[in-house]
Amino acid sequence: MKPSLIEKLKTLTYRYSEIGGLLSDSTVINDQDRYRELGKEYAQLEPIVKCFQQFQQNEKAIESAEEMQQEKDPELRKLAEEELEQLTLKKEELEDQLKLLLVPKDPNDERNVFLEIRAGTGGNEAAIFAGDLFRMYARYAETKGWRVNIVSAHEGEHGGFKEVIARVIGEGVYSQLKFESGAHRVQRVPVTESQGRIHTSACTVAIMPEVDEIDQIKINPAELRIDTFRASGAGGQHVNRTDSAIRITHLPTGVVVECQDERSQHKNKARAMSLLQSKLLAAERAKQDQEQAAKRKSLVGSGDRSERIRTYNFPQGRVTDHRINLTLYQLDEVIEGDLDPVIGPLIRELQAEQLAELSGE
């Protein structure tokens, strides 16, 4: 392992010990916010420190085995050789574990998200596909124990959605769904197609982490136009005769958000503002990402496949994720919400890239 990584691990071990002392300090205990913050940091450092302690113990055992190899007794030397072989394998395993533990965590991974699906090219068939995608994510959320609340929806003429925005609430939602942003393409014979021809349609999916108060972008109320209207469409069980639904337009950017899920205008406004915050923050992050991507592109050339991240081919029962050249003939299972076979490889690919960067430092 590189000396720079060893130094980093020693620094983290010192910090872990320091926090351990602070957590028993009465001043810290009485400050609930600080105590909670330090407790969280302590819990994050613990697996790294425990693994590093095992690594250090293993290093000492390797030193002892190497010393034993110098013994005159051939039996002792043979024992030392066998032990050294096992310890070297263990060292490699521990190094891999430590590198994985040192990979920077995405600060948004534990957040709830706003899921936005928009029908793209393909007219009515695209809207039907948007409905299929929404059901796929809703079923996936159900298997994970997450909750899905529709914030706003505009239904298609023949079913599905022209646009649907939902809030997905649960543990580690963003960590799993963050790979879903992009264009999703479907190839199938539409119900309305009499000639049996395969049509291609597309939808765009956006996954936006919900914003904490700390991260919020300052919004000038004078730059907002707020309209009220009667709730309709999805969430119709809450429809009433008052204009409880809210539409907010952020005038400088033209971003428009709606919420018609809650019974009261006040709650709808609060939810719409939360969605607006997430959209504006996502736009700001996207701008930063584009700037970074432009710099990278100038160095390594274009490899961007974000225009079309995944294809769902119904005649062949095939799902292809174009970012990692993954092809699965499990379309029925995937569209029914079994997304782990798709998301798992994407997570592993990201970890492999991060590990390669870490090893190259």
From Swiss-Prot:
* Protein modification: Methylated by PrmC. Methylation increases the termination efficiency of RF1.
Q: Which GO terms describe its molecular function?
A: translation release factor activity, codon specific
For this chain, the family text in UniProt reads: Belongs to the prokaryotic/mitochondrial release factor family.
Q: What is its main location?
A: cytoplasm
Q: Which UniProt keywords apply?
A: Cytoplasm, Methylation, Protein biosynthesis
Q: Which Pfam families match?
A: PCRF (PF03462), RF-1 (PF00472)
Region Disordered: what ranges? 286-306
Q: Tell me the function of this protein.
A: Peptide chain release factor 1 directs the termination of translation in response to the peptide chain termination codons UAG and UAA.
Where is the organism placed in the taxonomic lineage, from the top?
Bacteria, Pseudomonadati, Pseudomonadota, Gammaproteobacteria, Legionellales
Cellular component GO terms held in the UniProt record:
cytoplasm
Name used for this protein in its record: Peptide chain release factor 1
| Entry coiled-coil feature ranges | none
**Which residues get modified to N5-methylglutamine?**
237
